[in-house]
Amino acid sequence: MEEIKIETVVNGAPYSIETGYFAKQANGAVIVRQGDTAVLVAAVMSEEPQADIDFLPLTVEYREKYYAYGKIPGGFVKREGKPSEREILVARNIDRPIRPLFPKGFYNDVIITAYTLSADDQYDPDVLGIVGASAALHISDIPFEGPIAGVRVCRVDGQFIVNPTYQQKAKSDLEIVVAGSKDAIVMVEGGAKEVPEEVILEAMLFGHQEIKKLIELQEELRAKYGKEKIEIPIDEEEILLKEKFKELAYVRIKEAFNISDKKERNKQINAIFEEIKTTLEIPEEKVKKASFVYKDVVSNVMRDLVLYENIRIDGRKPEEIRPIWIKVGVFPRNHGSAIFTRGQTQAFVTVTLGSPSEGQIEESIEAGETLKRFMLHYNFPPFSTGEAKPPRPVSRREIGHGNLAERALEPLIPSEEEFPYVIRVVSDILESNGSTSMATVCGGSLALFDAGVPMKKHVAGIAMGLIKSEDKFVVLSDILGDEDHLGDMDFKVAGTRDGVTSIQMDIKVKGLTREILQKALEQAREGRNYILDLMYQAIPEPRKELSPYAPTVTTLRVLPEKISVIIGPAGKNIKKIIEETGVKIDLDPTGLVKIYATSKIAAEKAIDMINQLIMDIELGEVYLGKVTRVEDYGAFVELMPGKLSLLHVSQISSERLKSAKDVVKVGDVLKVKVSEIDDQGRIKVSLKDVPENVEAKNKFLFE
């Protein structure tokens, strides 16, 4: 069996692509390795194209196998379940750089499957999946205008590193995944800690140099093992139909683009199609195909208006941002809320504060179980675009958009020491016409300020677009949905006035030059600063006080050995405090106790109960105690967990008793007064001198 392996070195570790001895029934399959991490990627194509579609039916599935890490899945079911959020995000990162590189008119189903087969504690397998997908397609007979490659770039101590180790990633202030062809960058995804745009650009270009090396590996692999590509037939009928639509509809579509309202504009454009369809007497079975051709003409009109007349769909200039309307503190019961409206895009964003126990427990194969204290959930209901569709489960798109917005805000979220709350941000998109994820970033920052989360700065986001011809390009600020759909780029940039915190770029052309990237980043910074000015006008700083409906946090410091006393046997004591007060309690082995309560009264009651548990016994004070043992000479009374006292027979009654057993028994609860504490801490109590109207200091223990 033939085994072909092409090797190089990346970040000091061996890096290879191999094929020839596995998954041979797939159209193309490779294994990509870095160090001891290995990812298998297989590409399969259907025999026939799908009918009546105008998009590529591409599916990417990425799965991290437990066996790759030498582990068995936890829980009752001992096999991998549905894809995790991380696996979905990695699959999207594999999909996005390869999708623009399939030829127009290719409508066969393509399935890309990536499995992590082996994983060390050094190198993340996700970027190997990008290279593997490209290599599998490149050596296959599937039409593909690649190859491309993907790398991760981090900056540690001012130095860029390609495909860093996990340890290097943890120290970085910038982390981006860059994918590109030999000539240009095609995809970027990542985050940073307020890093300037110039550094982001240099990181992209640094990664592109390494990408070229990985593309050479793929070219060498194809030269040794590549299959002949299938040909996509030219549709002459489609070409003729497009010319007819241009002749009859171009000018009228151009006039329709003067309508700023999205619904009215689309209604007019659709009416033009219906009229010309009748004029051309297009048969019913070819109407769908004709509608796809008409869409191309609509796209051409929009692009020509921008490129040659500097006119956008809604009449704005290329760098102009839509009107913005902001409202904070929208509803009284939310801990924080904001509505951020930009043109016909609107996000209602809320913030809810909770205790550490309410954080998101995340289980990853590599890191195990971790607790996430800041989370952002993005929801995109069908009504936001006026569609009459039933609600759907959370989509991959919603997960991806939420992750992008979360990454934008996270660098400004205060540490747990500064702000001991779990923070959940929810963005419900109420209207959509482009850039909802960036509206979520803006609305999220406003809602966090409204909630009183002590963020040092606002974060804003903007989506940039691109219209490009062979000899000209125009960068668009704050793109509409149609500009995203019909344009060549969707470049989202979020950050503060001081730098970028999150970035995501997808393109539909074969790559972007340094000039275009630089122009887009500079124009994004100008737009972001304009939006930030409006946000600071709406709410210039975080509120000084939390919502009265937010949980209060009280912190106590106790001796570490007292933690077990607070918990009690089988959790008896802490359960009782929680049941009686409704609070949530977070205990740290260092002796830090955090009490989360819905009211000040509940917090004070919980503190009092904890103090009763851990207090020192004081001479002359009155306590309740349970009899644990009885002898003739007296009874042993437990005042608090682990605190025993002696009730001598002479201190039980003013009358002389022969034996304590005549009066008390095990299990009796007595109200006693501390009469003596000796040098060794031994406690003696009395029943004789107890005032009737004095409450026991530890009464809650016996209620």
Swiss-Prot record:
SMART domains: KH (SM00322), S1 (SM00316)
NCBIfam families membership: polynuc_phos (TIGR03591), PRK11824.1 (NF008805)
Organism from which the protein derives: Sulfurihydrogenibium sp. (strain YO3AOP1)
Nucleotidyltransferase keyword on record: yes
Cofactors demanded by this protein: Mg(2+)
Gene3D superfamilies linked to this entry: GHMP Kinase, N-terminal domain (3.30.230.70), K Homology domain, type 1 (3.30.1370.10), Nucleic acid-binding proteins (2.40.50.140)
Pfam family, one: RNase_PH_C
Main location: cytoplasm
Lineage: Bacteria, Pseudomonadati, Aquificota, Aquificia, Aquificales
UniProt-annotated location(s): Cytoplasm
Protein known as: Polyribonucleotide nucleotidyltransferase
